[in-house]
Structures are given as C-alpha cells and as structure tokens.
Amino acid sequence: MIYDYGYDVIVVGGGHAGVEAASASARIGAKTLLLTHNIDTIGQMSCNPAIGGIGKGHLVKEIDAMGGVMAKAIDMAGIQFRILNSRKGPAVRATRAQADRLLYKKAINSLINNQENLDIFQDSVDDLVVENNTVCGAITKTGITFRAKKVVLTVGTFLGGKIHIGKVSNAGGRAGDQPSNALAARLRSLPFRVDRLKTGTPPRIDRRSVDFSVMEVQHGDNPTPYFSFFSKGKIEHPRQIPCYITYTNNETHKIITDNLDKSAMYSGLIEGIGPRYCPSIEDKVVRFADKERHQIFVEPEGLNSIELYPNGLSTSLPFEVQCNYIRSIKGFEKAFIMRPGYAIEYDFFDPRDLKPTLETKHIKNLYFAGQINGTTGYEEAGAQGLVASINAAISIDSDKSWYPTRADSYIGVLIDDLITKGTKEPYRMFTSRAEYRLILREDNADLRLSDKACELGLLSKEDQQHFISKKNAIIENIAMMKNTWIGPQTQKARDLEKFLDKKMTRESTLFDLLKRPEIDYSKLQQISELNLNLQDDAVIEQIEISAKYSGYIERQNKDIEKTATLEQKAIPTDFNYSQVKGLSNEVLQKLTEQKPTTLGEASRIPGITPAAISLLTIYMKKTGFIK
C-alpha cells in the first residue's frame, strides 16, 4: 500500500540523530515524516544518562545555536550540571549535565510533538524505494510505502545489531528491541562500503543495595548552569542531586583477568572494533595493567529511579562474572544488578562515501546521520542529524546546500574528519581534534552559527530576537570600550590604581585595560564615573574574552584566512584525476575513490601530499576549473 502524503523528507529512526533531523527539516518548513519502530522510545537515552562533556558539550551548544532541541531538553531534564575544566581557558571549558532519563524523553517528546510540519508514524523500515540511483521513499515492515523527495537514515545500532553477554548472543538493536536486519541487507546490496563496530553498556545497579557513605560525593555547580542559550529565565531546572565516585581495585582486576576467555570481546565472538576513548572494563584492565584502580562515576538514572549507572564499567562478560566484579568494588559489596551489561555490534557505512552535506555519493537524495556513519555518542549523532536534514530540506526545489567547516564549528570538524579520513573505530569528539579551539568555544557557538540559523529559518522568532539583542549588545559595548579613553593623570585612573599591578603611564582605552590579567569587567564597573551598567553575564563574558584573548584570536583568524583559499576551490564531481600528470598511483586511487568536493577537503585525505595538491591546483587553473 502506498501512502503518498506529499512528504518532502522522511527521517528513519527516533534516536538523537533522528529527533534533531526531524525537527530541523520541519522548522525549515519541509513536510516531514519521522518513522520509528516504537513511538514510546523517541528520545530515549540508550546508554549513559548524561549530555555533554569535553568536546561533546561544544556540539550541544552548536546544535542549540542552530535551533536544535537537545540543549533545551537537557535543561528541562538535567539533575546535575557542571562546567568541566572551569579553571582552564575558555577554549576547553565544557558543560556536562546528568539527566533524569524519563524527564529527558518527556522533554524531547514535548518539543517534537508540538513541532509544525512533522508527522510521526510507528513501524520499522525494511526497504528503500530507489529509482535510477535516486531514493524516493521507504517501505515498512507491514508493507506500507511512504514516498518522499529525501530520506535521512538515523538508525543507530539497529543495522544487523547483535547483543553479547559472555558467550550468549542474540539479535537486537539494543536491549529489548529487535534489529533492522532487512534494512541492513538492503543497504549492503547498494554500492556502499560496510563494516562492523562495537559498543557496550554497564550493568545497572539498584541504589537501595549501595553504600554511598564510603564513596566520594560529587556535587553540581552552584549557580546551576544552563545548556541552551535560550533557556535562562524560561526553563526551570529539576531538583539537583549529587553523583558519587568509587574505584576498582586489584581484586576487581583479578576477577576480570581470570575470566577474559568468557568475554565476548576476548573470545572472538565480536568482530567489530570498540570505542578507544570509552573502553570496556575488560579493555581497561588489559591495556592499563599497571594501574591499580580505575575511577567509576556512580550516576543516578533519575530523581525517582532506583537504578544507578556505574559509568566506567561497560562490559561483555557473563552475568555471573559481572556480579562478582561489581561486588568487589567499594560501596558495591551488596550490590544487586537490575540489568546486566552487554556489548552490541552493528553495521556502519564508510563515511567517506558521503558528501559534506551527508548525502550519499552513490544514491541521490539519501542521507546518513549518526552511528551509521561510525560515530558514538548522543551529541555526535544529533549534530549529524541536524546537518543532514538541513541539507535535505533546503535542496528540495533547488541545488542549495549548507555545511559547517572546521573554521566555524566542531560540527564542521566532526563531518570533515568523517568524510576525509573515515574511521575504523567509533568516533567521538574531543577539543583536541580542532585546529581553531580558541575560536570554537562553547560560549560563542551562537555568535558563530545563529546568523546562519536565522537565514535558514531554524530559529523561532523569540530565539531569533534573543540572539540579535545579545549580538548587538556585544558589538555596541565593545565599540564603546574601544572608544573610551582614560588618561594616567585623571581621577578615573587614580580610582583604578587599587586594581592595577602597575600604574597607568599612558592613555588607554577601557578595552585595552580589560586585556590586563588583573582587570575584569566587574572591577571597571566599580569606577562610578565610567557608567558601566551592563548586567548580562553572557554579554560581559564575550567582552572579556574578546579583550583578553584578542591577540590569539587575531592569529587564528589569519590562519583561517590562509586555508580558506583551498576551501573555496570546488572540484567537479565528475573530475578526471587521471588527466593530472605527476600524481602517484596511490594519490590517484584515493582521489578517484573519495571524490573530494574542494581542494581543501582533498588536502586532508590521508596520503594526499602538498605536492599532489599543488599539481592538482596548477592543472585546474590551466584548464579553467578554477581562477
């Protein structure tokens, strides 16, 4: 049966990538259908009950700056908020929030269900409608065909998903859910490169069986931060509660090493490669055999939940072994496991087969986002869902496209890494992956991206006005401070002396004074004659960072300008690299396979040398492809 409701975009999957994708295309005005195997699991946190962290928090802020739902949802559902690296520079500070799982899912559903242009239908997708190498719709398990101009696949770990607990394996997309084997087989029949990856989750513990008195207490920040740029004064956080910290020990490690042959990872049952930066407890004990203990974050799953998430104990060991090593840990001596930990392996498709828009190179109008591209994490998934669906929506009746770059966002870094380098293990974001960290901060994500969000129609009128007011306040106040001078012999200078390490010897602007490490905006406000009445902390923060890091920021902007030339030089999709004399066979093969869209993208493909880029540039200039 064909249901032709005139959909512009179909999003397959209701996880974190799917939610951002469905929301984005609908906000732009595209008639959107979200297809999910179970409406009740939309927005579900399948693994850890937390959002953000180093690198990841930057992604959440950027999604929010583009009008996404993740930051607002966690503001409604977060039960502990912390700023990580708060004593370090602004480039590496990151927000992390512990979530109440039920409140988070409720918040996501509230935001999605009230979104115009968005329909939701419950059924698994088994097949795609593909005509002349162009996707035209999706076919569900019950035989219903939904036609659309664009399809975005955000299927998580469900493609050929297999769950392992010890040597017991069964098919599953996650615990309690069936995998999407029919869709996996269909995708394998298309000209995409496919491989397997693995991830895992720890056992869940009944909090009533845990002795918290012997653990370290970890409180959230006070005042409680907000994730969304648009939440303060509108959203009230739930009650805030602490997390706890405990540690493994030598006994824990012995139990694990004595039973490694029973682990699905170490017995050879799992083919997929696991995440390097979120390893199982088995991997930690083997790879870091010299460490006497490993830190475990004991995280509540919700205000009214009795389940605890022991972050750091992901495992594929048998249930009996899980019980034994859990009870060897301080505070867990009488722990009762409510759900066993498990590993899951699944299909992913080589992201080098994608364009920067996340449209596939082989099938037109088909987009991939999330774990299907080899990433791990809610935040990475949400970022991809956003970009894929933006491009699906804006290209319906035109050849428009938009994608972030390494110079303007961590989302740009994420996508560029994936499409140029690919991945052999689950990819997660870190601040160290970005070249321009000082520019790509959490605090200025809106200043970097919200203008584009306004242009694309992604922000509500209210959020748009909030952003414009903030941006104008920053511009106006910086201009005022750059044009307000204080002479060394004035009363203002004498009033400032109590704050200065060295007396003023020449006339300075307020902006230059703010560059001094001992001066901040609040101290300048104490000089009554200056009439600095600004009270908006977010605006003040931007003014201070602009002043104190101005030299570094200018340097990074110059670096960006140098590389921008290559980024602007487009390579036609049908470009014949064999015509370029002097390219090695290796370079020729890689360029032909990956089909980079710009010279900048080509330059970042592993194995492509500066000499090869030079030859390519000269040829393209001679033949008129670039000026």
From Swiss-Prot:
GO terms for molecular function: flavin adenine dinucleotide binding. NAD(+) binds at residues 274-288. Keywords: Cytoplasm, FAD, Flavoprotein, NAD, tRNA processing. GO terms for cellular component: cytosol. The keyword tRNA processing applies. It comes from the Bacteria. PANTHER family: GLUCOSE INHIBITED DIVISION PROTEIN A, PROTEIN MTO1 HOMOLOG, MITOCHONDRIAL. NAD-binding protein involved in the addition of a carboxymethylaminomethyl (cmnm) group at the wobble position (U34) of certain tRNAs, forming tRNA-cmnm(5)s(2)U34. HAMAP family: MnmG_GidA. This is tRNA uridine 5-carboxymethylaminomethyl modification enzyme MnmG.
